[in-house]
UniProtKB/Swiss-Prot annotation:
Taxonomic classification: Bacteria, Bacillati, Actinomycetota, Actinomycetes, Kitasatosporales
Cystine bridges: none
Keyword Thylakoid in record: no
HAMAP family named in the record: Ribosomal_bS20
Family under the similarity heading: Belongs to the bacterial ribosomal protein bS20 family.
Entries under Gene3D superfamilies matching the protein: Ribosomal protein S20 (1.20.58.110)
Record's protein name: Small ribosomal subunit protein bS20
GO MF: small ribosomal subunit rRNA binding; structural constituent of ribosome
Cited InterPro entries: Ribosomal_bS20, Ribosomal_bS20_sf
A GO cellular component annotation in the UniProt record: small ribosomal subunit
Species per Swiss-Prot/TrEMBL record: Streptomyces avermitilis (strain ATCC 31267 / DSM 46492 / JCM 5070 / NBRC 14893 / NCIMB 12804 / NRRL 8165 / MA-4680)
Amino acid sequence: MANIKSQIKRNKTNEKARLRNKAVKSSLKTAIRKAREAAAAGDVEKATEYQRAAARQLDKAVSKGVIHKNQAANKKSALASKVAPLKG
């Protein structure tokens, strides 16, 4: 345990940030999984809807500093390549 006052405060803020980031990452994984499953099932409308929602969440996570912009771009690209063949 830290003895310095500023470090004690820093530990508290780090823990809050860690929990917040964990929640955001968890919801991201869920959104991406929904889009992938809809694409695998061949449901064009649902896949498109979920892909759009996942892309939006990825962009928000980048703006909050939870993930890197290249990681978000990579995930969005992978989702798009799964959904695109369904559209025809």
